[in-house]
Design a protein with these regions (language model features):
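Membrane-proximal transmembrane or re-entrant/amphipathic helices at the cytosolic face
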Residues: 254-258, 263, 281-342
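Alpha-helical transmembrane segments of multi-pass membrane transport and lipid-handling proteins
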Residues: 3-6, 31, 129-185, 212-223, ...
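Interfacial/gating helices of multi-pass transporter permease domains
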Residues: 15, 53-61, 79-99, 126-131, ...
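Helix-loop junctions and terminal segments of transmembrane helices
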Residues: 94, 98, 102-136, 140-143, ...
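Interhelical loop/hinge segments that connect adjacent transmembrane helices in multipass membrane
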Residues: 11-21, 31-72, 111, 115-130, ...
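Helix-terminus/linker motif at the lipid-water interface of multi-pass membrane proteins
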Residues: 7-11, 69-101, 118-119, 155-165, ...
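Short runs within selected transmembrane alpha-helices of multi-pass transporters and secretion channels
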Residues: 1-2, 18-35, 64, 68, ...
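Helix-loop interface residues and adjacent transmembrane-helix termini in multi-pass membrane transporters
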Residues: 12, 82-85, 196-197, 223-227
Length: 342
Protein backbone atom coordinates (compact mmCIF):
# COMPACT_ATOMS: atom_id res chain seq x y z
CA UNK A 1 0.00 0.00 0.00
CA UNK A 2 2.71 2.50 0.99
CA UNK A 3 4.72 1.72 -2.16
CA UNK A 4 1.62 2.31 -4.30
CA UNK A 5 0.86 5.60 -2.54
CA UNK A 6 4.40 6.90 -3.02
CA UNK A 7 4.38 5.73 -6.67
CA UNK A 8 1.00 7.01 -7.85
CA UNK A 9 0.12 9.84 -5.43
CA UNK A 10 2.49 12.65 -6.30
CA UNK A 11 0.36 15.79 -5.91
CA UNK A 12 -2.34 17.06 -3.58
CA UNK A 13 -4.92 16.68 -6.38
CA UNK A 14 -4.30 12.93 -6.86
CA UNK A 15 -7.46 12.05 -4.97
CA UNK A 16 -8.74 9.37 -7.37
CA UNK A 17 -5.49 7.33 -7.40
CA UNK A 18 -5.38 7.54 -3.60
CA UNK A 19 -9.02 6.41 -3.28
CA UNK A 20 -8.44 3.52 -5.71
CA UNK A 21 -5.34 2.38 -3.80
CA UNK A 22 -7.12 2.48 -0.43
CA UNK A 23 -10.22 0.71 -1.79
CA UNK A 24 -8.20 -2.00 -3.53
CA UNK A 25 -6.06 -2.54 -0.43
CA UNK A 26 -9.12 -2.90 1.78
CA UNK A 27 -10.79 -5.40 -0.58
CA UNK A 28 -7.59 -7.45 -0.85
CA UNK A 29 -7.19 -7.40 2.92
CA UNK A 30 -10.71 -8.75 3.45
CA UNK A 31 -10.33 -11.34 0.68
CA UNK A 32 -7.00 -12.67 2.00
CA UNK A 33 -8.44 -12.77 5.54
CA UNK A 34 -11.42 -14.73 4.21
CA UNK A 35 -9.16 -17.29 2.49
CA UNK A 36 -7.04 -17.63 5.62
CA UNK A 37 -10.05 -18.21 7.88
CA UNK A 38 -11.67 -20.55 5.33
CA UNK A 39 -8.81 -23.02 5.83
CA UNK A 40 -9.93 -23.74 9.39
CA UNK A 41 -13.61 -22.78 9.34
CA UNK A 42 -16.13 -24.44 7.03
CA UNK A 43 -19.41 -22.99 5.78
CA UNK A 44 -22.54 -23.76 7.78
CA UNK A 45 -25.95 -24.02 6.15
CA UNK A 46 -28.47 -21.71 7.79
CA UNK A 47 -32.21 -22.07 7.05
CA UNK A 48 -33.86 -19.09 5.36
CA UNK A 49 -36.36 -18.85 8.22
CA UNK A 50 -33.56 -18.41 10.74
CA UNK A 51 -31.93 -15.73 8.58
CA UNK A 52 -35.22 -13.83 8.39
CA UNK A 53 -35.63 -14.01 12.17
CA UNK A 54 -32.10 -12.70 12.70
CA UNK A 55 -32.35 -10.03 9.99
CA UNK A 56 -34.37 -7.71 12.23
CA UNK A 57 -31.65 -7.60 14.87
CA UNK A 58 -28.98 -7.36 12.16
CA UNK A 59 -30.79 -4.34 10.70
CA UNK A 60 -30.79 -2.69 14.13
CA UNK A 61 -27.04 -3.33 14.38
CA UNK A 62 -26.57 -1.85 10.90
CA UNK A 63 -28.37 1.32 11.99
CA UNK A 64 -26.35 1.44 15.21
CA UNK A 65 -23.06 1.06 13.33
CA UNK A 66 -23.94 3.91 10.96
CA UNK A 67 -25.65 6.29 13.40
CA UNK A 68 -22.40 8.26 13.78
CA UNK A 69 -22.89 9.52 10.22
CA UNK A 70 -25.34 12.01 11.73
CA UNK A 71 -22.59 13.62 13.80
CA UNK A 72 -19.08 14.45 12.57
CA UNK A 73 -19.70 13.27 8.99
CA UNK A 74 -22.84 15.39 8.80
CA UNK A 75 -20.89 18.38 10.12
CA UNK A 76 -18.35 17.99 7.33
CA UNK A 77 -21.06 17.76 4.68
CA UNK A 78 -22.44 21.12 5.80
CA UNK A 79 -19.02 22.76 6.07
CA UNK A 80 -18.16 21.74 2.49
CA UNK A 81 -20.89 24.14 1.34
CA UNK A 82 -18.80 27.02 2.65
CA UNK A 83 -17.05 29.36 0.19
CA UNK A 84 -14.04 29.17 2.53
CA UNK A 85 -12.42 25.83 1.69
CA UNK A 86 -10.05 26.01 4.64
CA UNK A 87 -12.91 25.45 7.13
CA UNK A 88 -13.29 21.78 6.20
CA UNK A 89 -9.52 21.36 6.64
CA UNK A 90 -9.72 22.93 10.10
CA UNK A 91 -12.48 20.51 11.11
CA UNK A 92 -10.84 17.39 9.69
CA UNK A 93 -7.33 18.11 11.00
CA UNK A 94 -8.60 18.92 14.50
CA UNK A 95 -10.78 15.82 14.63
CA UNK A 96 -7.88 13.63 13.47
CA UNK A 97 -5.54 15.02 16.15
CA UNK A 98 -7.97 14.28 18.97
CA UNK A 99 -9.09 10.89 17.62
CA UNK A 100 -5.49 9.72 17.12
CA UNK A 101 -5.01 10.06 20.86
CA UNK A 102 -8.41 8.99 22.18
CA UNK A 103 -8.78 5.90 19.98
CA UNK A 104 -5.79 4.33 21.75
CA UNK A 105 -7.48 4.74 25.13
CA UNK A 106 -10.81 3.22 24.04
CA UNK A 107 -9.14 -0.19 24.17
CA UNK A 108 -9.67 -0.26 27.94
CA UNK A 109 -13.42 -0.26 27.26
CA UNK A 110 -13.58 -2.47 24.16
CA UNK A 111 -11.69 -5.40 25.69
CA UNK A 112 -14.15 -5.63 28.59
CA UNK A 113 -17.35 -5.96 26.53
CA UNK A 114 -17.13 -9.77 25.94
CA UNK A 115 -16.41 -10.39 29.62
CA UNK A 116 -19.26 -8.08 30.69
CA UNK A 117 -21.64 -10.03 28.44
CA UNK A 118 -20.34 -13.25 29.99
CA UNK A 119 -21.04 -12.00 33.54
CA UNK A 120 -24.55 -10.90 32.57
CA UNK A 121 -25.20 -14.29 30.99
CA UNK A 122 -24.22 -15.95 34.28
CA UNK A 123 -26.35 -13.46 36.26
CA UNK A 124 -23.19 -12.45 38.11
CA UNK A 125 -24.17 -8.82 38.70
CA UNK A 126 -21.48 -8.18 41.31
CA UNK A 127 -18.64 -9.13 38.94
CA UNK A 128 -20.35 -7.19 36.14
CA UNK A 129 -20.59 -3.99 38.18
CA UNK A 130 -17.05 -4.40 39.54
CA UNK A 131 -15.60 -4.72 36.03
CA UNK A 132 -17.57 -1.71 34.78
CA UNK A 133 -16.31 0.45 37.64
CA UNK A 134 -12.72 -0.74 37.26
CA UNK A 135 -12.47 -0.38 33.47
CA UNK A 136 -14.41 2.91 33.29
CA UNK A 137 -12.29 4.39 36.09
CA UNK A 138 -9.10 3.45 34.23
CA UNK A 139 -10.49 4.92 31.01
CA UNK A 140 -11.53 8.18 32.69
CA UNK A 141 -8.24 8.29 34.61
CA UNK A 142 -6.39 8.74 31.30
CA UNK A 143 -8.95 10.34 28.97
CA UNK A 144 -9.98 13.28 31.19
CA UNK A 145 -6.49 14.77 31.80
CA UNK A 146 -5.65 14.10 28.14
CA UNK A 147 -8.75 15.99 27.04
CA UNK A 148 -8.14 18.97 29.33
CA UNK A 149 -4.48 19.04 28.34
CA UNK A 150 -5.50 19.19 24.67
CA UNK A 151 -7.95 21.99 25.42
CA UNK A 152 -5.02 24.06 26.69
CA UNK A 153 -2.44 22.95 24.11
CA UNK A 154 -4.84 22.57 21.19
CA UNK A 155 -3.34 25.29 19.01
CA UNK A 156 0.23 24.12 19.60
CA UNK A 157 -0.80 20.53 18.82
CA UNK A 158 -2.43 21.70 15.59
CA UNK A 159 0.63 23.66 14.47
CA UNK A 160 2.94 20.73 15.25
CA UNK A 161 0.64 18.34 13.38
CA UNK A 162 -0.24 20.48 10.37
CA UNK A 163 2.12 23.54 10.30
CA UNK A 164 1.49 27.21 11.07
CA UNK A 165 -0.78 27.44 8.03
CA UNK A 166 -3.51 25.89 10.21
CA UNK A 167 -3.02 27.95 13.37
CA UNK A 168 -6.65 29.11 13.13
CA UNK A 169 -7.74 25.48 13.58
CA UNK A 170 -6.41 25.54 17.16
CA UNK A 171 -9.75 26.59 18.63
CA UNK A 172 -11.42 23.71 16.77
CA UNK A 173 -8.92 21.24 18.25
CA UNK A 174 -9.62 22.60 21.74
CA UNK A 175 -13.37 22.21 21.20
CA UNK A 176 -12.91 18.65 19.96
CA UNK A 177 -10.89 17.98 23.11
CA UNK A 178 -13.78 19.39 25.18
CA UNK A 179 -16.15 17.13 23.25
CA UNK A 180 -13.94 14.19 24.25
CA UNK A 181 -15.02 14.62 27.89
CA UNK A 182 -18.69 14.13 26.94
CA UNK A 183 -17.91 11.47 24.33
CA UNK A 184 -15.92 9.39 26.84
CA UNK A 185 -18.87 9.29 29.25
CA UNK A 186 -21.24 8.36 26.42
CA UNK A 187 -18.83 5.64 25.31
CA UNK A 188 -19.04 4.03 28.75
CA UNK A 189 -22.81 4.39 29.13
CA UNK A 190 -23.59 3.28 25.59
CA UNK A 191 -21.15 0.39 25.11
CA UNK A 192 -20.56 -1.03 28.57
CA UNK A 193 -24.06 -0.69 29.98
CA UNK A 194 -26.89 -0.18 27.48
CA UNK A 195 -25.46 -2.24 24.59
CA UNK A 196 -24.23 -5.09 26.79
CA UNK A 197 -27.68 -5.31 28.42
CA UNK A 198 -29.23 -6.10 25.00
CA UNK A 199 -30.79 -2.65 24.72
CA UNK A 200 -29.26 -1.85 21.32
CA UNK A 201 -32.63 -0.69 19.96
CA UNK A 202 -32.88 1.97 22.65
CA UNK A 203 -29.26 2.96 22.07
CA UNK A 204 -29.88 3.27 18.31
CA UNK A 205 -32.97 5.40 18.98
CA UNK A 206 -30.98 7.75 21.22
CA UNK A 207 -28.19 8.05 18.64
CA UNK A 208 -30.73 8.99 15.99
CA UNK A 209 -32.43 11.50 18.28
CA UNK A 210 -29.05 13.16 18.87
CA UNK A 211 -28.28 12.96 15.15
CA UNK A 212 -31.55 14.64 14.20
CA UNK A 213 -30.89 17.41 16.74
CA UNK A 214 -27.43 17.85 15.22
CA UNK A 215 -29.01 18.00 11.75
CA UNK A 216 -31.47 20.70 12.86
CA UNK A 217 -28.73 22.77 14.50
CA UNK A 218 -26.47 22.41 11.46
CA UNK A 219 -29.35 23.47 9.20
CA UNK A 220 -29.89 26.54 11.38
CA UNK A 221 -26.21 27.46 11.00
CA UNK A 222 -26.37 26.87 7.25
CA UNK A 223 -29.46 29.08 6.82
CA UNK A 224 -27.62 31.88 8.63
CA UNK A 225 -24.50 31.41 6.45
CA UNK A 226 -22.36 30.29 9.38
CA UNK A 227 -19.70 27.83 8.24
CA UNK A 228 -16.89 28.20 10.79
CA UNK A 229 -15.84 24.72 11.92
CA UNK A 230 -15.99 25.53 15.64
CA UNK A 231 -19.76 26.11 15.52
CA UNK A 232 -20.34 22.69 14.00
CA UNK A 233 -18.26 21.04 16.72
CA UNK A 234 -20.49 22.81 19.24
CA UNK A 235 -23.68 21.48 17.60
CA UNK A 236 -22.30 17.94 17.84
CA UNK A 237 -21.33 18.56 21.46
CA UNK A 238 -24.87 19.74 22.28
CA UNK A 239 -26.39 16.71 20.53
CA UNK A 240 -24.09 14.32 22.41
CA UNK A 241 -24.93 15.98 25.74
CA UNK A 242 -28.60 15.25 25.03
CA UNK A 243 -27.75 11.62 24.17
CA UNK A 244 -25.81 11.25 27.44
CA UNK A 245 -28.75 12.71 29.39
CA UNK A 246 -31.17 10.24 27.76
CA UNK A 247 -28.80 7.34 28.49
CA UNK A 248 -28.44 8.32 32.15
CA UNK A 249 -32.23 8.59 32.56
CA UNK A 250 -32.71 5.19 30.88
CA UNK A 251 -30.06 3.45 33.02
CA UNK A 252 -31.54 4.91 36.20
CA UNK A 253 -35.12 4.12 35.18
CA UNK A 254 -34.40 0.42 34.61
CA UNK A 255 -31.72 0.23 37.31
CA UNK A 256 -29.21 -1.40 34.95
CA UNK A 257 -26.23 -0.45 37.11
CA UNK A 258 -25.25 2.13 39.74
CA UNK A 259 -23.63 5.18 38.13
CA UNK A 260 -22.39 6.65 41.40
CA UNK A 261 -18.78 5.47 41.03
CA UNK A 262 -18.55 6.66 37.40
CA UNK A 263 -19.84 10.13 38.30
CA UNK A 264 -17.58 10.39 41.35
CA UNK A 265 -14.49 9.45 39.34
CA UNK A 266 -15.40 11.80 36.49
CA UNK A 267 -15.92 14.73 38.86
CA UNK A 268 -12.69 13.98 40.73
CA UNK A 269 -10.50 13.72 37.64
CA UNK A 270 -12.00 16.84 36.05
CA UNK A 271 -11.56 18.87 39.25
CA UNK A 272 -7.91 17.81 39.64
CA UNK A 273 -7.17 18.30 35.93
CA UNK A 274 -8.32 21.93 36.15
CA UNK A 275 -5.04 22.48 37.99
CA UNK A 276 -3.35 22.19 34.58
CA UNK A 277 -4.58 25.71 33.77
CA UNK A 278 -2.26 27.63 36.16
CA UNK A 279 0.60 25.25 35.28
CA UNK A 280 0.14 26.02 31.57
CA UNK A 281 0.01 29.79 32.02
CA UNK A 282 2.95 29.76 34.45
CA UNK A 283 5.11 27.84 31.95
CA UNK A 284 3.93 30.12 29.17
CA UNK A 285 4.97 33.23 31.12
CA UNK A 286 8.32 31.77 32.22
CA UNK A 287 9.31 30.96 28.63
CA UNK A 288 7.73 34.19 27.34
CA UNK A 289 5.56 32.53 24.72
CA UNK A 290 3.47 35.17 22.98
CA UNK A 291 2.59 33.35 19.75
CA UNK A 292 1.95 29.83 18.50
CA UNK A 293 5.12 29.62 16.46
CA UNK A 294 6.91 26.35 17.12
CA UNK A 295 10.50 27.02 18.16
CA UNK A 296 12.84 25.66 20.84
CA UNK A 297 11.25 27.82 23.55
CA UNK A 298 7.75 26.70 22.60
CA UNK A 299 8.73 23.02 22.54
CA UNK A 300 10.38 23.30 25.97
CA UNK A 301 7.28 25.08 27.30
CA UNK A 302 5.02 22.31 25.94
CA UNK A 303 7.23 19.58 27.43
CA UNK A 304 7.37 21.36 30.81
CA UNK A 305 3.59 21.86 30.84
CA UNK A 306 2.96 18.19 30.11
CA UNK A 307 5.60 16.98 32.60
CA UNK A 308 4.56 19.22 35.50
CA UNK A 309 0.86 18.58 34.83
CA UNK A 310 1.42 14.82 34.86
CA UNK A 311 3.45 15.02 38.08
CA UNK A 312 0.82 17.23 39.72
CA UNK A 313 -2.02 14.93 38.61
CA UNK A 314 -0.29 11.77 39.82
CA UNK A 315 0.81 13.37 43.11
CA UNK A 316 -2.65 14.62 44.06
CA UNK A 317 -4.25 11.27 43.25
CA UNK A 318 -1.54 9.45 45.21
CA UNK A 319 -2.02 11.71 48.24
CA UNK A 320 -5.78 11.11 48.31
CA UNK A 321 -5.17 7.37 47.70
CA UNK A 322 -7.28 7.19 44.57
CA UNK A 323 -8.02 3.51 43.87
CA UNK A 324 -7.30 3.77 40.13
CA UNK A 325 -4.00 5.52 40.79
CA UNK A 326 -2.96 2.83 43.25
CA UNK A 327 -4.04 0.12 40.80
CA UNK A 328 -1.98 1.72 38.01
CA UNK A 329 1.05 2.07 40.27
CA UNK A 330 0.79 -1.60 41.28
CA UNK A 331 0.79 -2.65 37.63
CA UNK A 332 3.80 -0.44 36.81
CA UNK A 333 5.67 -1.56 39.92
CA UNK A 334 5.08 -5.25 39.22
CA UNK A 335 6.20 -4.92 35.61
CA UNK A 336 9.31 -2.91 36.49
CA UNK A 337 10.13 -5.18 39.43
CA UNK A 338 9.89 -8.29 37.27
CA UNK A 339 12.00 -6.65 34.57
CA UNK A 340 14.80 -5.71 36.97
CA UNK A 341 14.52 -9.06 38.73
CA UNK A 342 15.27 -10.81 35.45
Amino acid sequence: MLISIFTFVKAENDIIPYALIMTTTTILNYFISFLWIKKDVSFVKIPIKEILISSKNMFIMLLLANANMLYTLLDRLFITRSPHLEYISYYTISMNIVMLITIVLTGTINVTIPRLSYYLGKKDNDSYEYLINQSSSLFLFFIIPTGIGLILLGTFATVIYASEKYTAAGIVTSLFALRTLVWSLEYILGNQIIFVNDKERTLTLYYFIGGIINLLLNTLLYINNIFQAEYYVLTTLIAECIVVTLEILFIKKYNLVSLRSIFQKSTRYIAISLGFIPIYYTCKNIFQITSHTININALIMICCTITFSALYYASVLYIIKDSTMMYTMDILYNKLFKKFKK
